[in-house]
Structure formats: structure tokens, C-alpha cells
Curated annotation (Swiss-Prot):
PROSITE patterns, A to Z: ANK_REP_REGION, ANK_REPEAT
Protein source organism: Acanthamoeba polyphaga mimivirus (APMV)
Protein name per its UniProtKB record: Putative ankyrin repeat protein L93
Keyword set includes Manganese: no
Domain of life: Viruses
Keywords: ANK repeat, Repeat
Segments forming a coiled coil: none
InterPro entries in alphabetical order: Ankyrin_rpt, Ankyrin_rpt-contain_sf, Multifunctional_regulatory
Gene3D superfamilies from the UniProt entry: Ankyrin repeat-containing domain (1.25.40.20)
ANK repeat boundaries on the chain: 24-56, 65-98, 102-135, 139-172, 176-209, 213-246, 250-283, 287-316, 320-353, 357-386, 390-419
Family matches, as Pfam families: Ank_2, Ank_4
Length: 421
């Protein structure tokens, strides 16, 4: 039952039970629908109202939110009104393809809320009344997308099946370039589920389709594996032959994403899965960064150990000459950073190589003032008087960036105080 004040055309009322915001422009018919179950003869009142041809003429009027009486009735036919009311509205000429302000149709609302409504009957009924199945809202979402992304919450997998059986376009994309399958993969651990992912795959979804950023479903699942998606989804995609080496528009691969988001549960297992399925461990993104570089930047020591054990190139350089060791020194004020630097050095990282400007790992450590990193590098025989292309030494970096403790340490280690750039 809806708890609302008496009808007044100037008042605002809720369109849906879960809607905290109220809306103006309600017709008397809309009001009668949200209060149908407030009265023993609520349906009869609506039937009587629509027996008047004058009232039927306004059956498709939209309120200030763009909702029609049919939209409200379809969404609330289990709570505020009855299914008989939905049937009545359709029989009296309620239009099924009008859009709300956000361009949602009544079919989208029914598909989104089929679990709350109680069955897929309303969705089927709307389709029988020629509701357009592939029409998109302002975000490019279709009824199938709404059902797929919410199949474990407000919608159901039965709704997804129904829409597919009625020839919903499984490959249609939204404004982000994502289709129903990609969305199901992204939310397979929350509002959607693995059964929906399997269903969409079995019905012909292209497993390696790209969104506007060049991301595949596998990339999406890797990014969200410990939030809205899960490792089961990744395993399924890999078992179904998802390409592990597709690159997005900036050159990222699924492995790089797994390493970037590696400080989460299951991350090491995900990286292992990708490597076992042929992920290229040494390929670089658009900037030349490898998976190892991402792991070093984001300081996941277990990921770094795994990559090194799988023969990641420890001395690979990006397009400006950065190595994994330089990145570890640059981001040395993070957890595990000293342990990571030690690991890289123990595994053969070149301590004195320079980037495109001639900067060494020690220079990065001096610039970013991580005293423990500097001590470790010096203990491992880093060249204390190395010069970059401008003739700068680590001591000069420390002086320019006013790192007093670093300056003292370098002088104690006999840095050349008289060197000239």
C-alpha cells in the first residue's frame, strides 16, 4: 500500500515504491494506480475510470518524470496495484514504446524489475503488445542489458532467456561500447551471476568483443575480479578461449591489469591463470610498460616474484628508458618497496643503467628521498658519482630537492662534492 496524501493535481507523488523522490504532473489515473491496494475495490475504481472515453484519451499522458500510467503499473503490479490493471491499460490503448525522461521504456522497467514483479509474464505481455525489444535509453542500454546486469538481483535469468528467445540483439552496444555480455562479466559476483555469463556465451556473444576503450570481457573481469566480478568468471572466459594478449587503445593487456590491481585477494592466482593460458609476459603497453613494471609501481611483491619466476625481463625498458628497478625506486615510499628493490637486485637488475635522460635508480631514489632505498643501492655498489646527460650526479639531485638526510648519507659514502655538471 502506498502511503500518500489525497489526490491533488498540484501535488507530487512517488512513481515507484523504491523511489525516494516524488514527481509532479500525476494524472488521476496514475494516482489511482499507486493507491489501488489502499482500497478493497481499487481495481474496480480504475476500471470505472477508464470506462469513460474522455479518461482513455489521456491514458498515455506523461508526468514530470516522463512516466506513464503503464510504466507505474508495470513496476508496481506486485505492491501497489495488480496485474489486472496492467492488462486493462494495454487493452485500453496504453502505448508500450513511450520513453521516460531518461529514455527508458516500459519494457526496460519490466525487464529490470522482473524478480520484484514476481515473474516474466509482464515482460512477455509487453512483447506481445509489440514493445520494441532493442530500443536504447540515453546511456545506450537495452532491455537485455538491464536484465543481464541485474539477473541476480532485481531481474532474473529467466528474463534474459525470454528476451533472447524473442530475438533481442545480443551484440548491441551501449554508449561505452559495452554489450550485455561485458556487463554480466563485470557484475558476475554481485547483481549478475556466472550463469548469465554462460548463457550469453552459449547464445553467441563474441568473447573477444571490444568496448570503446578496446577492453574485452576478460580485461573487465580482471580489473573487477575482487569487487563486482570474480575469479570464476576469469576461469570461464579463459576456458572458453578468451584471447589473453589483446591490447586496448593504450596498449594494456589483461595481464597488465591483473598486475596493476594485484594488491587484492586472488590476484596471484589470476596472474598464474593468465600466464598459463599464454599471456605475453614481456609485451609493453603504449608507453612500453611491461607487467613487471606495473607490479613494481603498485608494489605487489608476490606478483613480482611470480613474474620473475616466469622469466619476466627484469631489465626491459619503456619508451623513455625506465626499468622496473627505477620504478621501484621512484615509488619507494610504499609498503614492501625496500624488499622489492632488494628482490630485483638479487635477480639481476642492472643497478647502473640509465633511462633516456641518463638517470639511474640511485638518482630516482635521491630525488624521491627514500633513505632506506639509497642505503640499499649504495650497499649493492650503485655508482655514487654517475652522471646523467646533463652531468648531474645523485648528490646534485639531493641538493636540488633539499633532502638533507640524503645529502649527509651521500657525503658519508664519499660522493664527489666538487663534481661539476
Amino acid at each position: 500500500m502506498a502511503s500518500v496524501e489525497p489526490y491533488n493535481s498540484a501535488n507530487e507523488y512517488p512513481c515507484y515504491q523504491e523511489d525516494k523522490n516524488k514527481c509532479g504532473g500525476f494524472t488521476r489515473l496514475m494516482y489511482m494506480i499507486i493507491t489501488e491496494k489502499n482500497h478493497k475495490n481499487g481495481y474496480k475504481m480504475i476500471y470505472s475510470h477508464l470506462s469513460n472515453k474522455k479518461n482513455v484519451k489521456t491514458i498515455n499522458r506523461q508526468n514530470n518524470c516522463g512516466c506513464t500510467a503503464l510504466m507505474i503499473a508495470v513496476t508496481e503490479c506486485k505492491h501497489w496495484c495488480s496485474r489486472k490493471t496492467v492488462n486493462l491499460l494495454l487493452s485500453k490503448g496504453a502505448k508500450v514504446n513511450l520513453m521516460k525522461n531518461e529514455k527508458q521504456t516500459v519494457l526496460m522497467l519490466a525487464s529490470l524489475n522482473s524478480r520484484q514483479i514476481g515473474s516474466t509474464d509482464i515482460v512477455k505481455l509487453l512483447l506481445d503488445y509489440d514493445a520494441k525489444i532493442d530500443i536504447s535509453d540515453e546511456d545506450g542500454w537495452t532491455a537485455l542489458m538491464y536484465a543481464s546486469i541485474n539477473s541476480n538481483e532485481s531481474s532474473t535469468i529467466a528474463t534474459v532467456k525470454l528476451l533472447l528467445n524473442r530475438d533481442a540483439d545480443i551484440n548491441k552496444k551501449d554508449n561505452q561500447g559495452k554489450n550485455s555480455f561485458m556487463w554480466a562479466c563485470q557484475y558476475s559476483n554481485t547483481t549478475s551471476n556466472i550463469k548469465t555469463v554462460k548463457l550469453l556465451l552459449n547464445r553467441g556473444s563474441n568473447i573477444d568483443e571490444l568496448d570503446n576503450n578496446g577492453w574485452t570481457a576478460l580485461m573487465i573481469a580482471c580489473k573487477y575480479a575482487n569487487t563486482t566480478s570474480n575469479i570464476k568468471t576469469i576461469k570461464l572466459l579463459l576456458d572458453r578461449g578468451a584471447d589473453t594478449n589483446i591490447k586496448d587503445k593504450i596498449g594494456l593487456t589483461a595481464l597488465m591489469l591483473a598486475c596493476k590491481y594485484a594488491n587484492t585477494p586472488n590476484s596471484i592466482e589470476i596472474i598464474k591463470l593468465l600466464l598459463d593460458k599464454g599471456a605475453d609476459i614481456n609485451t609493453g603497453n603504449g608507453e612500453g610498460w611491461t607487467a613487471l613494471m606495473f607490479a613494481c609501481k603498485y608494489a605487489n611483491i608476490e606478483a613480482i616474484k611470480l613474474l620473475l619466476d616466469k622469466n619476466a625481463d627484469i631489465n626491459a625498458k619503456d619508451k623513455i628508458g625506465l626499468t622496473a628497478l627505477m620504478l621501484a625506486c621512484k615509488y619507494a615510499n610504499t609498503p614492501n618497496s625496500i624488499e622489492i628493490i632488494k628482490l630485483l637486485l638479487d635477480k639481476g637488475a642492472d643497478i647502473n643503467t640509465g633511462n633516456g635522460e641518463g638517470w639511474t635508480a640511485l638518482m630516482f631514489a635521491c630525488k624521491y628521498a627514500n633513505i632506506e632505498a639509497i642505503k640499499l643501492l649504495l650497499d649493492k655498489n650503485a655508482d655514487i658519482n654517475a652522471k646523467d646527460k646533463d652531468g648531474w650526479t645523485p648528490l646534485m639531485f639531493a641538493c636540488v630537492y633539499a633532502n638533507i638526510e640524503t645529502i649527509k648519507l651521500l657525503l658519508d659514502k664519499r660522493a664527489d662534492i666538487n663534481e661539476i655538471s
